[in-house]
Design a protein with these regions (language model features):
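Flexible active-site lid/hinge loop adjacent to a nucleotide/diphosphate
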Residues: 1-73, 182-183, 207
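Extended acidic/charged loop-beta regions that coordinate divalent cations
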Residues: 3-33, 71-116, 156-163
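Fold-independent oxyanion-binding glycine-rich loops
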Residues: 3-6, 27-28, 61-63, 81-84, ...
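Residue-level signal for inorganic ion chemistry
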Residues: 4, 26, 44, 59, ...
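Residues at the starts of beta-strands that form the adenosine-phosphate
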Residues: 21, 57, 77, 143, ...
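P-loop/Walker A phosphate-binding loop and immediately adjacent motor/lid segment at beta-alpha junctions
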Residues: 47, 54, 73-81, 189-192
Length: 215
């Protein structure tokens, strides 16, 4: 079972009866803060950190500025991934894949896996997502060959999802619903040097109105 465990779920003890084999941390930004969520960023971070007190092994992004707060008081064995510093799994030689009808990333890894990898989802965040997936699968005993085959085929609906409409332009759908994720997607797409970039977005979901102003 692969389960997304929210900060609110941890705060409200919805998963207190579980001991997870692996707990994963990718990144943290000021989000989920408001009257119906967390009172402050500090509370949000503390609730996120609870995951690493109820899992056997933790897998964390060594490049995230909040990682020390997340692993504070951890009780699990830790594994790290990074694009910038020494870690159990590191990415290097990162490049942009831009072929007819598809865009993505390619990179090499060192550490517990020494491979060349391709993922057909654009952006540096896709490299980080690939690293954490590769590291988790490696720790679970899955072969490098199977990991690379899966990575080459993976697509996520609503995450920088290419929609075939016309040869004259490219349409991409993304779930970005706050300032940080919207900025990340637009920055990513700019790296492919389009002639023009048009963004149409909404602010639904009954979330904090502050999100709309930030976006």
């Amino acid at each position: 079972v692969v389960m997304e465990v929210s900060s609110q779920g941890l705060m409200l003890h919805r998963v207190s009866g579980f001991v997870f084999d692996y707990g994963i941390f990718t990144n943290l930004s000021p989000d989920h803060i408001g009257p119906n969520e967390h009172a402050s960023f500090e509370e949000y971070q503390e609730c996120k950190s609870l995951l690493f007190r109820q899992c056997k092994e933790g897998i964390v992004n060594a490049d995230d500025e909040h990682v020390d707060g997340i692993i504070k008081n951890h009780t699990c064995k830790l594994h790290t991934f990074s694009c910038k510093k020494d870690a159990d799994l590191m990415a290097g030689a990162v490049g942009y894949l831009d072929e007819e009808g598809q865009i993505g990333m390619h990179f090499t890894t060192t550490g517990c896996m020494n491979v060349y990898a391709v993922v057909h989802i654009p952006g540096s965040f896709s490299v980080y997502n690939s690293l954490v997936t590769m590291l988790t699968c490696h720790l679970a005993g899955i072969s490098d060959e199977a990991i690379l085959r899966g990575l080459d085929k993976v697509k996520v609906r609503g995450r920088v999802e290419l929609v075939p409409v016309s040869k004259d332009f490219t349409v991409i759908i993304d779930y970005a619903h706050n300032e940080v994720s919207t900025r990340s997607v637009l920055t990513t797409l700019k790296e492919y040097h389009p002639k023009r970039l048009i963004c149409v977005y909404g602010g639904g979901g009954n979330r904090s109105k502050l999100r709309r102003y930030d976006m």
